[in-house]
UniProtKB/Swiss-Prot annotation:
Single GO MF descriptor: aminomethyltransferase activity
Entry annotated with the keyword Coiled coil: no
Function of the molecule: The glycine cleavage system catalyzes the degradation of glycine.
Domain of life: Bacteria
A GO biological-process term: glycine decarboxylation via glycine cleavage system
Entry similarity comment: Belongs to the GcvT family.
Enzyme Commission (EC) number: 2.1.2.10
Quaternary data: The glycine cleavage system is composed of four proteins: P, T, L and H.
Chain segments annotated as coiled-coil in the UniProt record: none
GO cellular component entries: cytosol; glycine cleavage complex
Sorted UniProt keywords: Aminotransferase, Transferase
Protein name: Aminomethyltransferase
Organism (species): Nitrosomonas europaea (strain ATCC 19718 / CIP 103999 / KCTC 2705 / NBRC 14298)
Pfam families in UniProt: GCV_T (PF01571), GCV_T_C (PF08669)
Length: 363
């Protein structure tokens, strides 16, 4: 039996194409993935992300516990409502999950973790807590729903739906959040566009979804969510990284704090392990489509040097095929590589990602 979000009936009422997404019954699209993609880039779209899990951690020493749990430094979180993107690592540096941490008070931090890793994450966090901070209370919030409203007009349309929300959220910077009654409003997202991710009680989600739709926000499914995040150069857990790779070879060095004296799980391995691979962007120069797991040839014939596409597909905004690929370190942006597509080697250019940000092509 597939798990369902509080919006399942709403998706079906909108004639969504439903698919099994990691054990969840989720909308792939509502008729046109392409239209949904463009709605987010040009206006406003909304995604049901209630399958992701909010985890509240309460107690006296939450900050100290998180200092050792994650690779980024939670001491950056000084302003209530501020958010931090980070990874949890295994002792050998592999990525257990990527997540967002919100600082709400010294005794209350909120984590948002991926759906497919939620059970594993809870087991890991509670296991670490039992050892290091047994007095903490760890609460998975399955009573909450989450809706992401994204696009250049997303915030304005949310303000039109939630009374008094503009005054309290208009001055939020990216990666800041605020509570407004039952709404937890965060200026975050997974599309490369502006917008909010809004957490609210599950019982209120369907009504809020309908009000957003009435305000001109287009529903968007997992298909558009994937093409948008790929254009934005944002990693997808299970494709671009997992426990077999570390953040330094996954384009996530910026989320790892190795400079402070603070210790965290996996730090020693990261310090001792040479970084032989890197995650890069690819733009296909020949005709064809880049797909996950295609082999990337990074050297001339006879020399070592192979990589693999981790996420690939067609970019509706750029109207060409793009990919994220893990290749040997030392290959610079601007260099040409070849991707093995069936029995052919197609030329591609290495680029710095993101490919698109705030509706504008960057490559």
């Amino acid at each position: 039996m597939l798990k369902t979000t509080p919006l399942n009936a709403a998706h079906r009422a909108m004639n969504a194409k439903m698919v099994d997404f990691g054990g969840w019954d989720m909308p792939l699209h509502y008729g046109s993935q392409l239209d949904e993609h463009h709605s987010v880039r040009r206006d406003a779209g909304m995604f049901d992300v209630s399958h992701m899990l909010t985890v509240d951690i309460h107690g006296e020493n939450v900050r100290q516990f998180l200092r050792g749990l994650v690779a980024n430094n939670v001491d950056k979180l000084t302003l209530p409502g501020k958010a931090l993107y980070t990874c949890m690592l295994t002792p050998t540096g592999g990525i257990i999950d990527d997540l967002i941490i919100y600082f709400l008070s010294e005794s209350w931090f909120r984590l948002v973790v991926n759906a497919g890793t939620a059970d594993k994450d809870i087991d890991w966090i509670t296991g670490q807590s039992r050892q290091l901070a047994p007095a903490l209370t760890i609460t998975p919030r399955r009573d909450l729903a989450m809706i992401a409203v994204q696009g250049p007009n997303a915030r304005t349309k949310v303000w039109n739906v939630i009374p008094d929300s503009q005054a309290i959220s208009e001055n939020l910077k990216p990666f800041q959040s605020v509570m407004l009654g039952d709404y937890f409003i965060a200026r975050t997202g997974y599309t490369g566009e502006d917008g909010f991710e809004i957490t609210l009680p599950a019982g209120q989600a369907a009504d809020f979804w309908q009000k957003l739709h009435a305000a001109g926000v287009a529903p968007a499914g997992l298909g558009a969510r994937d093409t948008l995040r790929l254009e934005a150069g944002m990693n997808l857990y299970g494709q671009d990284m997992d426990e077999t790779v570390n953040p330094l070879e996954s384009g996530l060095a910026w989320t790892v704090d190795l400079k402070s004296e603070r210790d965290f799980t996996g730090k020693q391995t990261l310090l001792e392990t040479p970084v032989n691979r890197q995650l890069v962007g690819l733009v296909l120069l020949d005709k064809g489509v880049l797909r996950n797991h295609q082999k990337v040839i990074t050297r001339q014939e006879g020399e070592a040097g192979e990589g693999e596409i981790t996420s690939g597909g067609f970019s509706p905004t750029l109207n060409q095929s793009i990919a994220l690929a893990r290749i040997p370190a030392g290959i610079a942006a601007g260099e040409q590589v070849h991707v093995v597509v069936r029995d052919k080697q197609l030329a591609a250019k290495v680029v710095k990602y993101p490919f698109v940000r705030n509706g504008q092509a960057l490559v």
